Regions:
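Conserved beta-strand-loop-alpha-helix junction that forms the acyl-donor binding cleft
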Residues: 106, 116-128, 143-144
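A short helix-loop-beta-strand connector motif used in the catalytic cores of GNAT acetyltransferases and
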Residues: 44-56
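A conserved beta-turn-beta hairpin within the catalytic core of GNAT-like acetyltransferases
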Residues: 73-84
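Conserved beta-strand in the GNAT
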Residues: 56, 62-72
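Conserved acetyl-CoA-binding loop of GNAT-fold acetyltransferases
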Residues: 130-139
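A short, internal acetyl-CoA/4′-phosphopantetheine-binding micro-motif in the GNAT/acyltransferase core
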Residues: 85-96
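Conserved acyl-CoA
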Residues: 98-114
Length: 144
């Protein structure tokens, strides 16, 4: 069966499915991050739905990936930038086309604002980001 991937902003009734997908991120990277709280994740997803960006990828009507971002303010300036909050695609669906499409949606949402895209899982894909004109601004360092 041919896989057809569709990309769209979720409807309000799709948010529960988005929360469930994001818990799969926690399952995959649980050794790197603290335990996820269902209420906190649901609250964050709803906040992004109303005030930011959520864009999902669906393969044959099944949610396979999502990107979420929200406007934020620099600590030193009133100017806003776009802060990526999550960017997750299920492992068996990870490919350039899906990642590219979700990142292009993020860039379009940003318009002329700077986008900050931290990679904190250790699975950095520099070529993907370079192809889409992102610039490497350093590294995330972690203690504990």
């Amino acid at each position: 069966m041919r896989r057809v991937v569709q990309y769209r902003k979720p409807e309000m009734e799709d948010l529960e499915e988005t929360v469930k997908l994001l818990f799969k991120f926690r399952e995959e990277f649980g050794n790197l991050f603290p335990e996820a709280d269902l209420n906190k994740v649901a609250e964050t997803v709803e906040q992004h739905y109303h005030y930011g960006l959520i864009h999902n990828a669906y393969s044959n009507e099944k949610l396979i990936g999502s990107i979420g971002a929200i406007p934020s303010q620099w600590w030193f300036s009133p100017k806003k930038f776009i802060s990526e909050t999550w960017f997750y695609v299920l492992p068996k669906h990870r490919n350039y086309a899906t990642a590219r499409k979700l990142l292009v949606e993020l860039k379009q949402y940003a318009e002329n604002r700077t986008v900050l895209l931290p990679v904190s899982t250790g699975f950095d894909k520099p070529l993907l980001y370079k192809r889409l004109k992102f610039k490497n601004m350093g590294t995330i360092w972690r203690y504990n």
